[in-house]
């Protein structure tokens, strides 16, 4: 039996869709690169909700490209296999044994979990890594850190071919150098490099914080590149936020129109950012 409360819910839903029309039109045909952090993956229910959002984006004409992390899953597997980690200045050294685990977890467990979730919601996702089709060519970041790489070149042809055919690429952040040696790449860095190569309309960095905050702890909804640089210089932006804002700035310099840092644990975070007036998190634009 239908009730008035149910009718009100449907009216509210219809109103929300109506208000979203300008944004749906705005992003039709746009490429949006989404970095899905390991801490944002959470439960199977959260993964399914993220997958539904991605499938909806594809359904309304957006071209989503996903780059994922997997730090917590890598740590869990290293512990399970009793592989001890060495750290240099707080950064993990990726030796050969660790690199084998990293590739297994990222390309296998994590990547295929995301692909399965998207396909389970009616999408058509394809799981790859930066090694496929020489997507990401990298170099060693620091010999002291072992097999950790920095992107030197991104060849976006495979991604363009996939998105033109309405596939959803899901990329594990691995790359190889000119000799074929595999390297682990920071997920944020990989996402920024991919977004720049695609000249993406948006780079969405899904993390476990609500966005960039000021001294009072308030989330700043819109910032310029210069404001980010000033806040980093005076210490307002510090700690784990620095790599994310650095990725955002590098992406902007590479031709991405805007980057957004937002809480990937929040329900429908990507949809709120793209298709509502107020968005979600902190959007950073070039000066």
From Swiss-Prot:
<feature type="site" description="Transition state stabilizer">
    <location>
        <position position="244"/>
    </location>
</feature>
<feature type="binding site">
    <location>
        <position position="92"/>
    </location>
    <ligand>
        <name>substrate</name>
    </ligand>
</feature>
<comment type="function">
    <text>Catalyzes the ATP-dependent phosphorylation of N-acetyl-L-glutamate.</text>
</comment>
<dbReference type="GO" id="GO:0003991">
    <property type="term" value="F:acetylglutamate kinase activity"/>
</dbReference>
<feature type="site" description="Transition state stabilizer">
    <location>
        <position position="35"/>
    </location>
</feature>
<dbReference type="GO" id="GO:0005524">
    <property type="term" value="F:ATP binding"/>
</dbReference>
<dbReference type="InterPro" id="IPR001048">
    <property type="entry name" value="Asp/Glu/Uridylate_kinase"/>
</dbReference>
<dbReference type="Pfam" id="PF00696">
    <property type="entry name" value="AA_kinase"/>
</dbReference>
<dbReference type="InterPro" id="IPR041727">
    <property type="entry name" value="NAGK-C"/>
</dbReference>
<feature type="binding site">
    <location>
        <position position="184"/>
    </location>
    <ligand>
        <name>substrate</name>
    </ligand>
</feature>
<dbReference type="InterPro" id="IPR001057">
    <property type="entry name" value="Glu/AcGlu_kinase"/>
</dbReference>
<dbReference type="GO" id="GO:0005737">
    <property type="term" value="C:cytoplasm"/>
</dbReference>
<feature type="binding site">
    <location>
        <begin position="70"/>
        <end position="71"/>
    </location>
    <ligand>
        <name>substrate</name>
    </ligand>
</feature>
<keyword id="KW-0067">ATP-binding</keyword>
<dbReference type="GO" id="GO:0006526">
    <property type="term" value="P:L-arginine biosynthetic process"/>
</dbReference>
<dbReference type="GO" id="GO:0042450">
    <property type="term" value="P:arginine biosynthetic process via ornithine"/>
</dbReference>
<keyword id="KW-0028">Amino-acid biosynthesis</keyword>
<comment type="pathway">
    <text>Amino-acid biosynthesis; L-arginine biosynthesis; N(2)-acetyl-L-ornithine from L-glutamate: step 2/4.</text>
</comment>
<protein>
    <recommendedName>
        <fullName>Acetylglutamate kinase</fullName>
        <ecNumber>2.7.2.8</ecNumber>
    </recommendedName>
</protein>
<dbReference type="InterPro" id="IPR037528">
    <property type="entry name" value="ArgB"/>
</dbReference>
<keyword id="KW-0418">Kinase</keyword>
<keyword id="KW-0055">Arginine biosynthesis</keyword>
<dbReference type="InterPro" id="IPR036393">
    <property type="entry name" value="AceGlu_kinase-like_sf"/>
</dbReference>
<keyword id="KW-0808">Transferase</keyword>
<comment type="similarity">
    <text>Belongs to the acetylglutamate kinase family. ArgB subfamily.</text>
</comment>
<dbReference type="InterPro" id="IPR004662">
    <property type="entry name" value="AcgluKinase_fam"/>
</dbReference>
<keyword id="KW-0963">Cytoplasm</keyword>
<keyword id="KW-0547">Nucleotide-binding</keyword>
């Amino acid at each position: 039996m239908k009730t008035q409360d149910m009718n009100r819910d449907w009216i509210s839903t219809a109103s929300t869709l109506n208000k979203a029309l300008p944004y749906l039109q705005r992003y039709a045909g746009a490429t949006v690169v989404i970095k899905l952090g390991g801490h944002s993956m959470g439960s199977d229910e959260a993964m399914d909700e993220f997958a539904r959002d991605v499938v909806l984006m594809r359904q309304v004409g957006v071209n989503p490209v996903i780059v994922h992390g997997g730090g917590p899953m890598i740590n869990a597997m290293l512990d399970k296999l009793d592989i001890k980690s060495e750290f240099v200045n707080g950064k993990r050294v990726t030796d050969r044994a660790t690199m084998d685990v990293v590739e297994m977890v990222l390309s296998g467990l994590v990547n295929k979990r995301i692909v399965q979730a998207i396909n389970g919601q009616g999408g058509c996702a394809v799981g790859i890594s930066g090694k496929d089709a020489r997507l990401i060519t990298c170099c060693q970041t620091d010999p002291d850190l072992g097999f950790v790489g920095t992107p030197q070149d991104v060849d976006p042809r495979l991604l363009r071919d996939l998105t033109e055919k309405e596939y959803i690429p899901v990329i594990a952040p691995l790359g190889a150098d000119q000799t074929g040696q595999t390297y682990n790449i920071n997920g944020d860095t990989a996402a920024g490099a991919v977004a720049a190569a695609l000249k993406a309309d948006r780079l969405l960095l899904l993390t476990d914080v609500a966005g960039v905050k000021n001294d009072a702890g308030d989330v700043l909804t819109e910032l310029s590149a210069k404001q980010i640089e000033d806040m980093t210089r005076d210490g307002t932006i510090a700690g784990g936020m620095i790599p994310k804002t650095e990725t955002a700035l590098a992406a902007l310099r590479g031709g991405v129109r805007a980057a957004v840092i937002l809480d990937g644990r929040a329900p429908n975070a990507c949809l709120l950012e793209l298709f509502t007036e107020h968005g979600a998190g902190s959007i950073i634009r070039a000066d």
